[in-house]
Curated annotation (Swiss-Prot):
Keywords: Cytoplasm, Phosphoprotein
Identification of the protein by name: Protein kintoun
Subunit (UniProt): Interacts with Pp1alpha-96A, Pp1-87B, Pp1-13C and flw.
The species this protein was found in: Drosophila pseudoobscura pseudoobscura (Fruit fly)
GO biological processes: axonemal dynein complex assembly; cilium-dependent cell motility
Lineage: Eukaryota, Metazoa, Ecdysozoa, Arthropoda, Hexapoda
Domain of life: Eukaryota
Length: 846
């Protein structure tokens, strides 16, 4: 009863009857009245009177006369039995359509027409009809069903019995009328024709039309007109003509039944814990329940059901109950562990299929794979095999996954240049650069985050192919390919027999480096062909040609013996290294010995108190610049001392150079890979130097070499005019400079503020000094200079060259550098935290 009531409520829109609104008191009053014998007798008499045909005729005549007084002609249509069509509404509710006849309906008529598709001639039929309202009824098993009446002219039914095509057109017209009027979907694939002339009790219907020639009495307003609805307008007097269908709707051979998929879950308390794997299966149901509505089937013996891991297929070929359904499941199910049950009362098939869930190990492997892919593109260098310690068990034990014994895969087919790139993959040509070194070529492919395991190379004698892939932030791979081919033999002018011996490809963070090694006796080509593949290559030039450097000092040629002299003095140790003696150098050495034994002057003794070392390479380089090509020819037999320093010469004093374009520099540069100069190296042939004094400073207490040059006096380029004061000196204060920047101020603001404060202090010191104080300051300064020359434990060393000229006609103003003592220097600059140098000018006369 509940099922029938639910279906009746669902299809209440199929009729215009309103639901009875009865209260409980009214229902009790009706029940009490029916319980009385007198009331039941009166009620049955009323029913018999209403159903009496004679009384029905009197009722119809009175209604006709009443409508005629309003100017409306009405006709009562009494359906006569014809045949019945059985189908279903929306695949759920059983439905009967009575095809009846009545002479009150117009006759069908036809016209000769032409088929627009085939061009053949035929008849175009116009079939009038009348419909009654749908009503509820019961079938033979007392189940709820729906009944509709469609009334045609008796001639239409007569033609349907003689012509099958006309009968089919008549049935289609009736079905279209029901679907259009009541907005329902009828099952046309499962039409049945029961052996019935009419379903239920025939009920007449009324056809209303405006009177063609109303009488004056009929035109007068009736006193009861306000009780009836308004007259229809004159435009509605004509019957409604429906548009003719140019193409009939295709009738499906099988009907698609209604179905529903339900996901079934079990309450598992382990899913409500705080474990990491507690909610792995929250979104995966325990089973799937598929319900299929089959109202025309009596049992499952009349249909076929096939279930796979991902789909359900149902087929019923029974006449009047043709169903076909192919359903894809949202989850993988176990087709062997499912079950099906058919409810004969509801005509419903229920299929229960358990869902296949992945194991915990498979879930963890999947999450590890996703984590690996996400970390490969994060830009942070991590080990790919590292696992998060959070995923370990509390006891530190991780279950070992059983290793699957798999057979070794067969060897892949050999790659060829034509099959190296896949047709289904889109490749891009990366940006590249090429460098050559002897018999090797290096290609730099500018592609970042390349997967090392995706690099595949293919080598031939004269070509190389490489392909690789990268994975971006969206886990979408991007494929790259590069093809390089050596030029043909005709293009090579200097070497023709070189070929590629081996290749190496390595992936870095921002690029891929591919190295090509040619034959041992081969040379890198000047050009090459490159592109995405062998077709459409472009020629590129090799601009970076390099040659491997060979160490000439490691040659096995014996070095000639050198003259090494060591002289000890009170303040320093002088080591002199000379090449093999010649007639010229012997005389120069004698003069140097005489100058050394000669009593030095007062100023020279003051300078000699400082320890000096002479740079061998500086003198050799100056000799090379002075002698020129002639000097090099004369000393061809003399072995050259390996150059240990590189210097540039200043261009500021042009008078010392003369007409020759020789550069002089005040900066000294050292080779990054050559040996550092020692502090005791002496300069051979000092008098042969033809340039002015070099002031190249080297700190003996530091491994770093700095350059400080005071000034280069102008000297004659002759041997007599060579200066002896080529000093190289630098001094560093013991104080460490420290600069503190506050976070709430800018650097430029602090710099200006400190400079202003320093200037104010200097002006204040100058104002405090009187004339007498200035004299005391000079005496104190002279005393400090004398103490500086005395030997002490904290002695400053000089590591430069001191070259002076012997010419009496030229005077040079050499700016010799003198420094304050550490105590004086600290007193003068303790507040400024800076290093200051004081330069004293002295004139040297020889």
């Amino acid at each position: 009863m509940s099922t029938a009531a639910g279906s009746r409520k669902k299809h209440s829109k199929l009729h215009n009857e309103e639901r009875a609104d009865i209260t409980k008191d009214e229902f009790e009053a009706i029940r009490e009245a029916l319980s009385k014998e007198e009331f039941r007798k009166l009620f049955f008499d009323y029913v018999e009177e209403v159903q009496d045909p004679e009384n029905r005729k009197i009722y119809e005549q009175e209604i006709t006369q009443l409508e005629k007084e309003r100017g409306v002609d009405i006709k009562f249509v009494h359906p006569k039995p014809g045949f019945v069509v059985k189908t279903s509404i929306d695949g759920e509710l059983k439905c009967f359509i009575n095809i009846a006849s009545s002479p009150e309906v117009a006759r069908p008529n036809s016209e000769v027409g032409m088929n627009p598709e085939t061009g053949g001639r035929g008849l175009s039929w116009s079939i009038p009809m009348a419909q009654t309202g749908g009503r509820d009824d019961c079938d033979a098993k007392n189940n709820h069903c729906k009944v509709f009446d469609v009334v045609f002219h008796p001639d239409a039914l007569h033609l349907s019995t003689r012509d099958s095509q006309f009968r089919k057109a008549l049935i289609d017209t009736a079905l279209d009328a029901v679907e259009r009027e009541y907005e329902v979907a009828l099952d046309r694939a499962n039409l049945k024709y029961p052996k019935l002339d009419y379903k239920g009790i025939a009920r007449p219907t009324v056809i209303r039309k405006l009177a063609a020639n109303p009488t004056p009495e009929e035109q007068e307003p009736h006193p009861l007109e306000h009780m009836y609805p308004t007259k229809p307008p004159a435009s509605n007097s004509e019957p409604k003509i429906l548009p003719m269908k140019t193409k009939a709707a295709p009738v499906p051979e099988f009907a698609v039944p209604k179905y529903s998929i339900k996901q079934s879950h079990d309450v598992d308390l382990s899913e409500y814990t705080d474990e990491l794997d507690a909610k792995l299966h929250v979104t995966v149901p325990r089973s799937l329940v598929v319900e299929i509505e089959l109202p025309l089937l009596r049992s499952t013996a009349e249909c076929q059901l096939d279930v796979t891991a991902k789909s359900v297929y149902l087929l019923s070929e029974r006449l009047g109950a043709k169903y076909r359904l192919k359903l894809d499941l949202p989850f993988v199910v176990d087709d062997k562990a499912g079950n099906a049950r058919f409810d004969t009362e509801k005509r419903r098939l229920s299929i229960t299929l358990p869902v296949v869930r992945k194991s915990v190990n498979q879930q963890r492997q999947m999450h590890d794979t996703l984590r690996y892919l996400s970390r490969e593109d994060s830009g942070v260098e991590l080990h790919s095999n590292s696992e998060s310690p959070v995923e370990d068990d509390a006891d530190g034990y991780m279950p070992e996954t059983p290793e699957l014994e798999t057979a070794a895969p067969p060897d892949p087919p050999a790659l060829t240049p034509s099959t190296f790139l896949k047709d289904s993959v889109h490749y891009q040509l990366p940006k590249f650069d090429c460098n050559a070194l002897d018999n090797a070529m290096a290609f730099v492919l500018d592609v970042a985050h390349v997967q090392p395991d995706s690099i595949v190379t293919l080598k031939t004698d004269r070509s190389v192919s490489v392909k690789f892939a990268t994975i971006g932030s969206g886990y979408y791979p991007t494929h790259y390919a590069f093809y390089m081919e050596l030029p043909s033999v005709d293009m090579e002018e200097y070497h023709k027999d070189h070929c590629i011996e081996s290749i190496e490809a390595e992936a870095w963070d921002n690029n891929v480096i591919m190295k090509l090694f040619l034959g041992a006796e081969s040379k890198a080509p000047t050009s090459y062909l490159a592109g995405l593949h062998a077709n459409g290559l472009k020629e590129y030039q090799v601009y970076g040609h390099y040659k491997a450097k060979t160490d000439k000092n490691n040659e096995c040629e014996p070095n000639p013996p050198r003259d090494v002299q060591i002289m000890r003095t009170d303040d320093a140790v002088v080591i002199t290294v000379r090449p093999p003696h010649t007639s010229i150098t012997t005389e120069e050495d004698d003069e140097q010995q005489q100058q050394l034994h000669k009593k030095p002057s007062k100023k020279q003794r003051k300078r000699n108190k400082k320890q000096r070392s002479y740079s061998e390479s500086a003198c050799e380089e100056m000799l090379d610049q002075q002698d020129g090509p002639l000097g090099r020819k004369k000393d061809a037999t003399t072995p050259m001392v390996p150059q240990r320093k590189q210097r540039s010469y200043s261009e500021c004093n042009d008078s010392t150079i003369g007409s020759e374009n020789v550069n002089r520099g005040i900066l000294k540069r050292f080779s990054r890979y050559g040996p550092r100069p020692s502090m005791s190296d002496s300069c051979s042939s000092i008098d042969d130097c033809g340039f002015s004094s070099h002031s190249c400073s080297v700190d003996a207490s530091s491994s770093l070499f700095s350059q400080s040059f005071n000034g280069i006096p102008e000297e004659d380029r002759t041997e007599e005019g060579l200066s002896e004061s080529c000093k190289k000196t630098v001094r560093f204060n013991d104080q460490i400079m420290k600069q503190v920047f506050r976070h709430d101020s800018s650097i430029l603001g602090q710099r200006k503020k400190n400079q202003k404060r320093r200037n104010c202090k200097l002006r204040a010191q100058q104002r405090r000094l009187s004339e007498g104080d200035s004299a005391d300051y000079e005496e104190t300064r002279d005393t400090a200079l004398k103490q500086q020359g005395e030997p002490s434990g904290n002695k400053l060393h000089d590591s430069g060259l001191d070259l002076t000229g012997a010419s009496a006609s030229h005077r040079t103003d050499n700016n010799s550098k003198s420094y304050r003592t550490r105590q004086d220097h600290a007193d003068a600059d303790a507040k400024n935290d800076a290093m200051m140098f004081e330069m004293d000018d002295e004139d040297d006369e020889i």
